[in-house]
Regions:
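N-terminal edge beta-strand
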Residues: 23-58
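Beta-strand cores of secreted/periplasmic/IMS beta-sandwich domains, seen most often
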Residues: 46-75, 108-115, 121
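Short beta-strand and strand-turn-strand segments in soluble, beta-rich domains
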Residues: 41, 87-95
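Sec-dependent signal peptide recognition
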Residues: 3-10
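N-terminal signal peptide c-region/cleavage motif recognized by signal peptidases
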Residues: 15-17
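Soluble periplasmic/extracytoplasmic beta-strand elements of cell-envelope proteins
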Residues: 32-34, 58-60, 123, 135-137
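Extracellular/periplasmic metallocenter environments
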Residues: 21-27, 43, 95-139
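Short aromatic-acidic-glycine turn motif
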Residues: 77-88
């Protein structure tokens, strides 16, 4: 029985090491999403973001202020652990994000950890037909 418990403990330890992809002790990886540009109100700096479960990220979303941008990514927001949100130097600790709305020029930073793999689409409400859609791919 003692040998079985020793084997089980070692197997459990090894499987934990193999399944863990992230190391939260490492500095969060920066991701940037810029909405609007000097040439187009409907430009997005990036449409696809790839990340891994268990790793820390900081998503910086900035707006040029030409349009009101309402970012909807409900499925993605439900599958991340939100560490904090910073809006113009003010840090908020919120457990859940429903949407992010930028009514004027500004920046929002979300610090988070993806907890479930999947392909999660996001869009800018009312501007999908202008190409303001994207995807978060979590491995």
């Amino acid at each position: 029985m003692a040998n079985f418990l020793k084997f089980f403990s070692i197997a459990l330890f090894i499987s934990t090491i193999v399944l863990a992809k992230g190391d939260l002790a490492i500095r969060a990886k920066k991701l940037e999403l810029k909405l609007g540009s000097e040439t187009s109100d409907y430009e997005m700096s990036q449409k696809v973001f790839e990340m891994e479960t268990g790793k820390a990220y900081r998503l910086e979303i900035s707006s040029m202020g030409f349009k009101e941008y309402e970012i909807e990514a409900e499925d993605f927001f439900r599958n991340i652990w939100v560490r904090s949100i910073e809006i113009e130097g003010i840090e908020l600790d919120v457990p859940v994000i429903n949407e992010i709305e930028l009514e004027r020029e500004g920046e929002v930073e979300i610090k988070f950890v993806p907890i479930r793999p999947g392909n999660y689409e996001f869009e800018i409400e009312g501007l999908q037909s202008k190409g303001m859609v994207g995807k978060f791919i979590v491995k």
